[in-house]
Every structure is written in structure tokens, then in C-alpha cells.
From Swiss-Prot:
Domain S4 RNA-binding: 93-156
Superkingdom classification of source: Bacteria
Signal peptide location: none
GO aspect biological process, one term: translation
Name of the protein: Small ribosomal subunit protein uS4
Listed GO CC annotations: small ribosomal subunit
Species per Swiss-Prot/TrEMBL record: Streptococcus pyogenes serotype M49 (strain NZ131)
A Gene Ontology molecular function term of the record: rRNA binding
A UniProt-annotated Pfam family: Ribosomal_S4
Family: Belongs to the universal ribosomal protein uS4 family.
Coiled coil: none
Function as written in the Swiss-Prot or TrEMBL entry: One of the primary rRNA binding proteins, it binds directly to 16S rRNA where it nucleates assembly of the body of the 30S subunit. With S5 and S12 plays an important role in translational accuracy.
Length: 203
């Protein structure tokens, strides 16, 4: 299954979750898109619940199915902690996500574009791989030639708050993942146990 590239507002309404983080998609129409949307919230089976939760998390981070499943497999190899939480931490450590958490982009999709276009440095070296895994303490910054890119400056100005597990210098446009996040600091609306149950049959 390829990465979804259609309108985020439509997918947000289908999943019942704001993919942009603004909540605007659900403010006026908090039901699935389509002619019968307002009356189409039918009760889901156990599998349906697992699938819906998996899709919410996958679309939130903007990953293709193969990438998403591979991260689950990688999480199974971590000996400490629960599989679900370890999986969530691996998602958070992706470079595109850290760029988003720092406020250098307004959405993860935009953050991925900034990384792909070579605007982002890790410890002073350009990294254009969105899935690059960031370690605590590594410095994420904007390339000097990109420091006046309007979209980046607008994102920084629009960011009202940042998670406690990152630090950021708005003047220098650089920051870092200071530590790994705690479970209650990331995606409280997601039940990762359902996601793990969905993949248990495949692992």
C-alpha cells in the first residue's frame, strides 16, 4: 500500500483524527466524507477497530504500509519496554517527525518535504532521508542557504509550544531531541495495543 497523497482533511474526517494537528478539519464536519457521512459511523468489529487504529497512526505519521510494518518488526527486537511503546518511540525518532516537533514545519508532510529538499542538517551534515533515526543529543538545524525560506520561518513563528522532550533555539533555527519521549507525551488519542494486535498475526 503506497503513501496517501490526497487531501488531508478528507482523510482526517474518515479517521476521526486531525492529521494536520489544527483540528480545523473536524471543527465543522466531524463525520466521514460522502453523501451518507453523518450517519455512517457504524459499529466496528474487533478487526475493524484494530485496522482503524492502525490507519489513524499510520496516516498521522504519513508512512506507507511497508515502512510502517517494518518499524513494527524493528520494535520487536528491542528487549526493554512494551512493543507498542517502543514502536511509538521509533516513529517519534524519525527525522521528519523531529523536524515537525521542533516547529520547523507545520505538518509532518511539510517536514518530509524540507528533509527531501536538503534544507535540514543533522550535526552539521545534510541529511535528506526522512526516515533517518535521530538519537537524543543530535543537533537538528536548517542549512544556512535555507534559513530564509518563508515556509520555515512561518512555521517557527506559528509554533506556540513544543514537547518537553525537545529543545529549540528560534534565532539559530536549531534544536535537538533531548531525551526519548514518555508515553503520555505522544499521541494520547492512539491505542497502540490495537495496532500491535493488528500486526501480531503477521509477525
Amino acid at each position: 500500500m503506497s503513501r496517501y497523497t490526497g487531501p488531508s482533511w478528507k482523510q482526517s474526517r474518515r479517521l476521526g483524527l486531525s492529521l494536520t494537528g489544527t483540528g480545523k478539519e473536524l471543527a465543522r464536519r466531524n463525520y466521514v466524507p460522502g453523501q451518507h457521512g453523518p450517519n455512517n459511523r457504524s459499529k466496528l468489529s474487533e478487526y475493524g477497530l484494530q485496522l482503524a487504529e492502525k490507519q489513524k497512526l499510520r496516516f498521522s505519521y504519513g508512512l506507507g504500509e511497508k515502512q510502517f510494518r517494518n518499524l513494527v518488526v524493528q520494535a520487536t527486537k528491542i528487549k526493554e519496554g512494551t512493543l507498542g511503546f517502543n514502536f511509538m518511540v521509533l516513529l517519534e525518532r524519525r527525522l521528519d517527525n523531529v523536524v515537525y516537533r521542533l516547529g520547523l514545519a507545520t505538518t509532518r508532510r511539510q517536514a518530509r518535504q524540507f528533509v527531501n529538499h536538503g534544507h535540514i542538517l543533522v550535526d552539521g551534515k545534510r541529511v535528506d532521508i526522512p526516515s533517518y533515526r535521530v538519537d537524543p543529543g543530535q543537533v537538528i538545524s536548517v542549512r544556512e542557504k535555507s534559513m530564509k525560506v518563508p515556509a520555515i520561518l512561518e512555521a517557527v513563528e506559528a509554533t506556540l509550544g513544543r514537547p518537553a522532550f525537545v529543545s529549540f533555539d528560534a534565532e539559530k533555527l536549531k534544536g535537538s531531541l533531548t531525551r526519548l519521549p514518555e508515553r503520555d507525551e505522544i499521541n494520547p488519542e492512539i491505542n497502540e495495543a490495537l495496532v500491535v494486535e493488528f500486526y501480531n498475526k503477521m509477525l
